[in-house]
A protein has these predicted regions:
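Substrate-binding cleft of secreted/luminal carbohydrate-active enzymes
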Residues: 128-130, 138-143
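Histidine/acidic-residue-rich catalytic or RNA/ligand-binding cores of hydrolases
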Residues: 115-117, 141-150
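C-terminal accessory extensions appended to soluble enzyme cores
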Residues: 162-171
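A short, acidic, flexible beta-alpha connecting loop/helix-capping segment that sits on the rim
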Residues: 135-139, 168
Length: 171
């Protein structure tokens, strides 16, 4: 992944964006480039009071484990991200306890609703501030019910099983 900016800060403001996001790749061929570009984005965003979300990933050959994702998340926070999005993994509490800013989990690949809700619950219990799900919401049989179930996990401390029951009742 060799990512660059797709819109300027002025364009983001014109679009009434609430935040800007950028992917950083630790251990990848273009690690240095993504970190420098992210640092520049943070500087630009801070001039306008725009929060920055860092989306963390690791290079090919590196496992999505707490060691590497934790390093990527901590680097993102130290470079000025206001919030970090990363993948859920074993020992997730290592990531949340070493990152200086709130961490949310990426939704990842499409999984059954009960599994997505269990992962969300485990992540929140391990210190995640929330979840950033895409396909596990919009590819759900009932996206509205899934959003409400995820909300129950994040804001009402519902377990994955309780949230799945809510999902089934609402769909």
């Amino acid at each position: 992944l060799h990512e660059g900016l797709s819109v300027s800060m002025e364009e983001a403001i014109r679009m009434n964006a609430s935040a800007v996001a950028f992917s950083i790749m630790v251990g990848a061929e273009f690690e240095r480039d993504t970190l420098l570009a992210f640092s520049q984005l943070v500087d630009d965003a801070e001039r306008y009071g725009m929060p920055t979300l860092a989306v963390t990933a690791v290079g090919k050959g590196l496992e999505r484990d707490s060691r590497y994702l934790g390093l990527a998340s901590r680097i993102a926070g130290e470079l000025g991200a206001r919030i970090v999005k990363t993948y859920y993994c074993d020992n997730f509490e290592h990531i949340t306890s070493t990152c200086p800013v709130p961490v949310v989990i990426a939704g990842g690949k499409k999984v059954p609703e009960s599994d997505a809700l269990d992962i969300a619950y485990k992540a929140v219990q391990a210190g995640a501030a929330g979840v950033d799900m895409g396909r596990n919401i919009f590819q759900s049989e009932s996206p509205v019910a899934m959003v409400q179930a995820v909300r129950a996990v994040v804001h009402e401390n519902a377990t994955g099983a309780e949230a799945f029951e809510m999902y089934k009742d609402l769909k």
